[in-house]
Design a protein with these regions (language model features):
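N-terminal beta-strand-loop-alpha-helix module at the start
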Residues: 1-68
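Short phosphate-binding loop-to-helix
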Residues: 73-95
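Long, charged alpha-helical interface segments
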Residues: 136, 141-183
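Short Gly/Thr/Asp-enriched flexible loops that form oxyanion-binding sites at enzyme active sites
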Residues: 110-120
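Short, acidic/small-residue loops that bind anionic groups at enzyme active sites
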Residues: 121-138
Length: 183
């Protein structure tokens, strides 16, 4: 997959590990609109970039950047959702539906698992979301889908209640898995 194969309205930078692989790093640089999740703005700004918006409860954003970027900082104190979810809904409210998530993994495994698991919720909310990491990508899907691939590419399918799974050209057959991690 190449950078120009991915369409996007915006990129959300999570507060996990800052991207180092060229794919998520390039997406972040080329993005037409960048939303930083709370404290991720500190690292993004330190690297010489200015986000279009900073979203979160403000618990990890430095006081200096909170003040300096107060016009683009949207503080949402709700503790029932994480900052990534707040950022997705912020973008959906603006009509930005094709969203790339970067920096959403690493540092904390509980946040990594949570952020990956939330992709299904974002899809159900109307977002066309792709999570790019330094090691791969996650794409939530429903219904009939076709994905570009190449011989030898590693592919994992996490099944969240789908039935009748079918694929052509995979080494291992698909079935209606009983657990999400089996694919």
């Amino acid at each position: 997959m190449k950078v120009n194969d991915i369409d996007m309205d915006a990129v959300i930078l999570g507060n996990g590990e800052y991207p180092t692989h060229s794919m998520p790093e390039t997406m972040l640089i080329m993005a037409p609109y960048v939303v930083c999740c709370d404290g991720s703005a500190d690292e993004h700004i330190r690297r010489g970039f200015t986000p279009d918006a900073i979203i979160g409860d403000g618990d990890s954003l430095s006081p200096e950047n909170k003040e300096r970027f107060r016009t683009i900082f949207h503080q949402i104190d709700d503790q029932e959702t994480n900052d990534q979810t707040k950022a997705v809904h912020f973008l959906l409210d603006q009509g930005k539906k094709t969203i790339i998530l970067v920096g959403a993994t690493g540092k904390r495994e509980d946040h990594t698992l949570g952020n990956i698991s939330l992709l299904i919720d974002y899809m159900k909310a109307g977002a066309q979301v792709t999570m790019l990491t330094d090691h791969g990508m996650f794409i939530p899907a429903s219904g009939r889908n076709c994905f570009k691939s190449y011989p030898g590419q590693q592919i994992s399918i996490f099944n969240f209640n789908a039935t009748g799974l079918r694929a052509d050209g995979l080494v291992y057959p698909l079935s209606d898995f009983s657990n999400w991690w089996q694919g």
